[in-house]
């Protein structure tokens, strides 16, 4: 089942989500939108197992990173009615 990982611009660049991911889905990339000058990126979403550890680790109360599981994806992102 395919999962989607969405990184929002509320990311503070702390790397907590990257360190929490057991399958190395996330990585940090350069970004000038925060003090840390980096933002999380999800280049390997095909490896996501849907554990949502990245959400739990996020100090912004998972406002910066969200994992949408399979069919939950379109509903949660407001793409289905």
UniProtKB/Swiss-Prot annotation:
Domain 4Fe-4S ferredoxin-type: residue ranges: 2-31, 39-68
Gene Ontology cellular component list: chloroplast thylakoid membrane; photosystem I
Assigned keywords, A-Z: 4Fe-4S, Chloroplast, Electron transport, Iron, Iron-sulfur, Membrane, Metal-binding, Oxidoreductase, Photosynthesis, Photosystem I, Plastid, Repeat, Thylakoid, Transport
Metal-binding in keyword set: yes
Catalytic activity: reduced [plastocyanin] + hnu + oxidized [2Fe-2S]-[ferredoxin] = oxidized [plastocyanin] + reduced [2Fe-2S]-[ferredoxin]
Domain of life: Eukaryota
GO biological process, one term: photosynthetic electron transport in photosystem I
Cysteine disulfide partners in this protein: none
Keyword Metal-binding recorded: yes
Binding of [4Fe-4S] cluster 2, residues: 21, 48, 51, 54
Molecular function GO terms recorded: 4 iron, 4 sulfur cluster binding; electron transfer activity; metal ion binding; oxidoreductase activity
Named cofactor requirement(s): [4Fe-4S] cluster
E.C. number(s) listed in UniProt: 1.97.1.12
Chain positions recorded as [4Fe-4S] cluster 1 binding sites: 11, 14, 17, 58
Record localization: Plastid, Chloroplast thylakoid membrane
Function according to Swiss-Prot or TrEMBL: Apoprotein for the two 4Fe-4S centers FA and FB of photosystem I (PSI); essential for photochemical activity. FB is the terminal electron acceptor of PSI, donating electrons to ferredoxin. The C-terminus interacts with PsaA/B/D and helps assemble the protein into the PSI complex. Required for binding of PsaD and PsaE to PSI. PSI is a plastocyanin-ferredoxin oxidoreductase, converting photonic excitation into a charge separation, which transfers an electron from the donor P700 chlorophyll pair to the spectroscopically characterized acceptors A0, A1, FX, FA and FB in turn.
Cross-referenced PANTHER family: PHOTOSYSTEM I IRON-SULFUR CENTER, PHOTOSYSTEM I IRON-SULFUR CENTER-RELATED
Subunit structure: The eukaryotic PSI reaction center is composed of at least 11 subunits.
Protein name in UniProt: Photosystem I iron-sulfur center
Organism: Psilotum nudum (Whisk fern)
């Amino acid at each position: 089942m395919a999962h989607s990982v969405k990184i929002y611009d509320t990311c503070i660049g702390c790397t907590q989500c990257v360190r929490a991911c057991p399958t190395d889905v996330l990585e940090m990339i350069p970004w000038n939108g925060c003090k840390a000058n980096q933002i999380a990126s999800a280049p390997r979403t095909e490896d996501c197992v849907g554990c949502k550890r990245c959400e739990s680790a996020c100090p912004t109360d998972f406002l910066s990173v969200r994992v949408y599981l399979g069919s939950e994806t379109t509903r949660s992102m407001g793409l289905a009615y």
